Amino acid sequence: DYISQLVPILDRTFARGGNVVIPSFAVGRTQELLYFIRQIKEERMLKNYNDFPVYVDSPLAVEATNVFCDSYSDFDDEAASLIENGINPIAFPNLYVSVTSEESKAINSDPAPKVIISASGMCEAGRIRHHLKHNLWRPECTILFVG
């Protein structure tokens, strides 16, 4: 169960004042993470940090998320039920997307604990390298590989 594993990681990292940086594939995995994070926030599983910001930092992931949102007919029963009740299964308060490189760079200037989901699941190129440069050396931060 992804959520039961994700909650303590978020809780420990935020308690230390750190960021959770998640290298993720832009299509599929990013949207799955947003689905789980929405549930964590909605059910208030992080009692002291429920309003944490989440940044999706990848133009391709942003586009894929938009396509995903337009494909409601392809959702499973659980997601379809959420939609029928007026809930977007991958949207929530404090979700931010960055498209430009300036927006991407600004993410690391915010000292508040946050989740950064950035494309390039293998960390070989792209914006994730910028986020690793700013967070990898910080012991309070967590780099979370989600496959």
Task: Please give the residue ranges for each predicted region.
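Acidic/His-rich, metal-assisted hydrolase cores and their charged scaffolds
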Residues: 1-147
